[in-house]
Structures are given as structure tokens and as C-alpha cells.
Amino acid sequence: MILVRNIRLPLSAGEPQAFEKALHAARIPRGKVQHLGVAKLSVDARHGQPKLVYTVAVTLKEPAEEAAFAARCGDASLQQKVDFSVQNGIQPLAHRPVVCGLGPAGLFAALLLARQGYQPIVLERGPALDERVKAVEHFSATGELDVNANIQFGEGGAGTFSDGKLTTRIGDELCGFVTEVFLQHGAPEEIAWKQKPHVGTDLLRGVITSIRKEIEALGGEVHFNTALTGFEQKNGQLTGIFTTNGTFACEALVFAVGHSARDTCGMLMDGGLQLECKPFSVGFRAEHLQSEIEKSLYHEAAGHPALPRGEYQLSQHVGERCVYTFCMCPGGQVVASASEEGRVVTNGMSFHARNGKNANAAVVVSVGGKDFADDPRRAIAFQRELEARAYAAGRSAGEYAAPAENIQSFLEGRGQLNIGRVQPTYDRGVAAADLGALLPQELAETLRAGLRAYERKIAGYTAPEAILTGLETRTSSPVRLKREENFECTQLAGLYPCGEGAGYAGGIMSAAVDGLRVARAIISRYAPAEG
């Protein structure tokens, strides 16, 4: 297959024009073509006149001719499909492998193990997705929190209640395998070619359930409402685990508990395993009118049907720290994401259509080990303290209401909330608060400097009607459980730290890829348990 890149067209053009321009650029006669398709589509909104930028995939009737044609065009290259395969190992497993956590990392680790005949046992502290959705909706309506069934815990992990983004910077060939699995299980076809693919929380739920059912159909077992509580080991080798629903003998455990399993991290440290601090970030969730964001990004072309919903990604270095936007949700809403009683956490979510009035994104500042004397317990305690402050600051508006403030007020330290055209979407309600007072002064001032810089990049970002809701604290895990090159824990053989909670991923795609890497390491070493 030949990929012809950088096919730039006006918004009024479509696929036929892209195909013709690609063939002309690569000097490929139409009669030699077997198939034409869109491999990637993005928008270049620079210079005030947005352009569609296509990468066109060309398959010739005679594959042997593709290399010669690809060499004729500087924007063309030959691409060979890389099939992902793994060979089963020979060291016998006495027991079936166990996967702890059914977020993206655990889900894809379990899927690969199941497809290779290992019949994994999967443990998830939260409920199945249908029950989880009911618990989330109940919390949104009443403020009654289930600490094991919420936006953080349950089938699918935290990413289930998000925008369903599949973007990543890791550049791993396994990303293609993840996309293929999503497509096999009902994700929209556009995720294969959009520059910034997303599934949306509404469609993602069905995809996750379908993948889990494939695991079960291949002999895997899924135990919901089952939390990991301890380990059993002998001479530095894992021999079994303790859970809230009994014990499981195992010598291979995929530890993929997610970034909010603080009690599990505490159990590891209490049991003698050493965790290390890793960088994470804290801040707020910013809301603007989606239409205003698109006017700033697309100018006169805003609203054109060929354009996707406008989204942005901003960053600004302020001294030794970085202020950046995270998990931007066009046409989305801010959701109550607490998983511990008496603490408020924000996150963003949007449906596939992204048709809400508001745009939202986390605006956060980086923190790291030096802020906590490289003590992982202090890093976790810092998150908890901020969330407790947010709970107290918002409580006047109801249980798990969130503190909020206009961006201009935050910049000036006034603690005021005037609701105009931008209606806050946080589902438990908001209360006016001085958000700067909830953070250490240095972090608050750094965020202010970052926001002022954003105004120079997106006009109107700090407009008086724009709103901040807080606090955003779960951007990633604050800790890492170290592992060797073979993906085993450095301190306990048979334990395989995996995904975002263990400190090795950030987002759905990278977590899924890490799950595949860990599963591949287990498969390459071991043969399936007999019986």
C-alpha cells in the first residue's frame, strides 16, 4: 500500500478530489489502482483559512509496482501491514494468569491472554458496566457515593466516562492492533483515519462490554466486585493473592488497578513493596462556549459542516513547571468523579456527537517528587488534601458540589462566580469559591501565569464569562511500581505492574498498549496452565 500525504484541499472539497490529487502527485494512472481510501484526515487551521489535509491510501492491482511509484513522490511512502503475533512460551504455568483491573490496560491484557488460550481470571473491584452506569447516575442525582462503583472504578476503568480519546504520543505499532480491536467490537469506522480519533462515552460502553464478552467466550472468567487485598509469596516469587471474595493461587498477576486505587497502593507499601513518586498535575476544569472556541480557532470558517468540533491543546512553561491543558472535551460536560467520601474531583466527558454547548478542558500544573520529598505517601496525601478542600469549599451548594470561579476572578484573586452565557455543567452543582486559596500559593500563581499566556494563543480564553471548576487531581497516577525489562516487578517475581495506575501509561490508547506488552511478556515466557 502507498500512502500519499499532505493532500491539502479547501473545505468545499471531498474524498474524490483528494483521491485525484493524490494520484496526480504520485503519478499513478487510475487504471493501475485496485483501491483508494482515506488513511488520515486532519485540519490545518493556521493562517485563518482552515484546510483539509488528507493522507490517501493507494493499493495497486500489481503490488510489486508500489515501491517504484512511492519513490516518485516526496510525499509518498510504501507501507507494509505489520501483523501482531506472539509465540507461546514453554515454561509451564501451574495456575491460570490473573488480571487485576478491567480498565484499558487490564482489558487488553486479558483479551490477548484469552486469544492465546490462557483463559485468564480477571478481577475488578467495581461492578459490570450496566450496574456501574446506574451507580454513577444515582450519585449524580443524589450525592450518595458508592466508593467501588463510580467514574473511577468498575468495568472499563476511568476512561469509560470521558471523551473516549484514542490519541497518543507513544508511536507504538501496537496502536494499530488496539484500533483494530475497537473496530471489531463496534467502534465507529472513523477512528481508523481521523487525526484525533475519539469514540465518545456513549459508544465506548458497548465496545468495552463486547470485548469483555469475547474474553469470557474464550474461557476467561471475570469476577466483579472483587478487590485485591494482599499477596502471598515464597522466596520472592508470587504464589497467590487475597481478595474481598477469597484467595486465588497464581504465579503471574497483571497489576492494572488504575490511577485511583490509593488503598491498593497503600497495601503494597504496607506489604513491603517500595513505590516511587512520579510527576502528575493538579488544577481545574475550564469551561467556555464551544462556539466561541471555534470562532477563535476557525475564524470566519467556524460552523462549516466539513470542520470537526474545535479542540485545543495548550502548554506554557512557567519557571520549572508546566501549565497545560489535558483531556479537552468539545461539546462535553464536567462530571463529578469522586471515589472517596468527603472529597470532590472533576473530570471531563463528552458523547460521540460532541453536541453540547460548552467546551471543557483540564488546566493543570505539573508537580513531582521534589514537591513531596520523593515520598509516595505524601504525594497521595497531597491529592487527598486538595480534594477534601474542594469538598468543603463546595458543600454549601450540596453534597459533592464543586467550588467554581470565573477565570477573570481567579486571575485577580476575587473568589467570585457570575454565571452568564457559560452555564457550568458540573452535575452536582457549584458554589462560588476562591480557587486560588485551595492550592499552594506557588501553584496558584503558576496557573495564573499559564492562563494569561493562553489568552495570547486563543482570544477570549480568559473572557469574564469563562468558568473554572475544581479540583482536577486525577490526571495520572502519582506513583510508580518499578519493573524490569521483562515487565516483572523489580521486587516480586510474578507481579507485572501495568497501565496508568502502575505509572506506565496515560490515557486509553497507551494503557491498552501497555496491557498488550505485559500480556505478550507473560505469553512469551509461559505455556498455558493445563486443565
Which ranges hold each PLM region?
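Residues forming the flavin
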Residues: 1-50, 56-161, 165-185, 189-531
